Amino acid sequence: MSITVEEKNRVMTEFATKKGDTGSPEVQVAILSSRIATLTEHFKTHKKDNHSRRGLLKLVAQRRKLLDYLKGKDEARYNVLIAKLGLRR
């Protein structure tokens, strides 16, 4: 239910603000979004997996906190990120 190393590296290179960037809010939110998408697919076939559902809710809350932080620090970067990820339709 986790993402592969290749997928994680792809996301990091796509959203990195500079070379070797692994900790910026953009990268963290993108990785969390990838994990959330993976878990969402998992729940389409495993509807009663409540242990993993709790983990999904924790990931969503963590992503929300990072997005709130980014919006407070730099709203322009926040808007670019949510547009790139397709969040907040």
From Swiss-Prot:
Q: Which GO terms describe its cellular component?
A: cytosolic small ribosomal subunit
Single GO molecular-function term? structural constituent of ribosome
Q: Which domain of life is it from?
A: Bacteria
One Gene Ontology BP term is:
translation
By its UniProt entry, which Gene3D superfamilies does this protein fall under? Answer: 6.10.250.3130, S15/NS1, RNA-binding
Question: By its UniProt entry, which InterPro entries does this protein fall under?
Answer: Ribosomal_uS15 (IPR000589), Ribosomal_uS15_bac-type (IPR005290), uS15_NS1_RNA-bd_sf (IPR009068)
What are the UniProt keywords, alphabetically? Ribonucleoprotein, Ribosomal protein, RNA-binding, rRNA-binding
- Please give the CDD domains that the UniProt record associates with this protein: Ribosomal_S15p_S13e
| Family, per entry | Belongs to the universal ribosomal protein uS15 family.
Per its database record, what is this protein's job? One of the primary rRNA binding proteins, it binds directly to 16S rRNA where it helps nucleate assembly of the platform of the 30S subunit by binding and bridging several RNA helices of the 16S rRNA. Forms an intersubunit bridge (bridge B4) with the 23S rRNA of the 50S subunit in the ribosome.
Q: Which NCBIfam families match?
A: S15_bact
Q: How does it assemble?
A: Part of the 30S ribosomal subunit. Forms a bridge to the 50S subunit in the 70S ribosome, contacting the 23S rRNA.
Provide the protein name: Small ribosomal subunit protein uS15
From which organism does this entry originate? Paracoccus denitrificans (strain Pd 1222)
